[in-house]
Each structure stands twice: as structure tokens, then as C-alpha cells.
Amino acid sequence: MITKAIYPGTFDPITNGHLDLVTRASEMFSHVILAIADSSSKKPMFTLAERVILAKQVTAPLKNVEVLGFSELMAEFAKKHNANILVRGLRSVSDFEYEWQLANMNRHLMPKLESVFLMPSEKWSFISSSLVKEVARHGGDITPFLPAPVTKALMTKLA
């Protein structure tokens, strides 16, 4: 049986923490869609197309991972792609409160859609795309937190 999961997010940019979670999800499920949200409300630094390209580059070794952009409700995207599992990362208690609301709304919209929560590896538990961008803007070393192609793309954006 093929178990298809979706790991959604803005991924602006994709971090080593995200890569850790999608790698672990790829070991748990037959097929994983890394779904990149066209989130205009978050005012992303990278365009959707740029985020998709970067994610494809860094997930290329994961043969059962597909990278797609989306702009519809997650429940609709899941239906369209015949997926019934959402993978979400939980770094903190504050993440849990937000994710709990999302999981319940998604279940209301699509009753068979299950949310699976993964804890990041300890070394990535404090990393967020926003924090990494802030460190980069102030000249800090971001290389430990991002895959090399993403570091290069971020530094180019900030130049």
C-alpha cells in the first residue's frame, strides 16, 4: 500500500531543520510531497518559483520526495493529490497550539486527513526561516543552518 504524505510550509527559505523532517518523513511514508505555500500574507523573501527550485535541489537525493507549490486550502491540495497524511514539525509548545488548530480545521474540511507531528532533531529545534534570515541580515554566520545552495541564494538576495 502506498502511503502518501504531505509536508506543507512556506519554506522561505528551506532550512536544515526542514530537510531533517522531510528526510525522516521520507523514511516513514512511501511518497512525500513537500508542498510549498504561495503565502502572500507572509511576504516571503523568495518567490514561490525560487523556493520550489531550492527545495528540489536540496531534496534531490530523496527519491520518494516530490516538491510542488500550492495556493489552495491544504485539505483541497491533499484531496487533489490523494494524500491523507500531513506531516508537521513541532519545535515548541507555541508551535503545538497553532498546529492543533490547523489539524482540527483540516480534519473538519477533510475528515480522513490525519496530522502526524515530528519533533526536530535537537540541533535544529531552535531554527526557523525567519530567525536565519534575521541573522543573515545582520552579518551572522548562517552556514550551519542552511543547505549550501540555500545559503548562496540567501546571501545573493541580501547583497
From Swiss-Prot:
Uppermost EC category: transferase
A GO biological-process term: coenzyme A biosynthetic process
Main subcellular location: cytoplasm
Keywords, in A-Z order: ATP-binding, Coenzyme A biosynthesis, Cytoplasm, Magnesium, Nucleotide-binding, Nucleotidyltransferase, Transferase
Subcellular location: Cytoplasm
E.C. numbers: 2.7.7.3
Pathway connected to this protein: Cofactor biosynthesis; coenzyme A biosynthesis; CoA from (R)-pantothenate: step 4/5
Superkingdom to which the source organism belongs: Bacteria
GO CC entries: cytoplasm
Site keyed Transition state stabilizer: positions: H18
Cofactor entry: Mg(2+)
Catalytic activity: (R)-4'-phosphopantetheine + ATP + H(+) = 3'-dephospho-CoA + diphosphate
GO MF annotation list: ATP binding; pantetheine-phosphate adenylyltransferase activity
A Pfam family hit: CTP_transf_like
Binding-site residues for ATP, renumbered to this chain: T10, F11, H18, G89, L90, R91, E99, W124, S125, F126, I127, S128, S129, S130
Keyword Mitochondrion in annotation: no
Entries under InterPro entries matching the protein: Cyt_trans-like, PPAT, Rossmann-like_a/b/a_fold
Residues reported to bind substrate: T10, K42, M74, R88
Family according to the record: Belongs to the bacterial CoaD family.
NCBIfam families (UniProt xref): coaD_prev_kdtB, cyt_tran_rel
Task performed by this protein: Reversibly transfers an adenylyl group from ATP to 4'-phosphopantetheine, yielding dephospho-CoA (dPCoA) and pyrophosphate.
Subunit structure: Homohexamer.
Entry protein name: Phosphopantetheine adenylyltransferase
Organism from which the protein derives: Yersinia enterocolitica serotype O:8 / biotype 1B (strain NCTC 13174 / 8081)
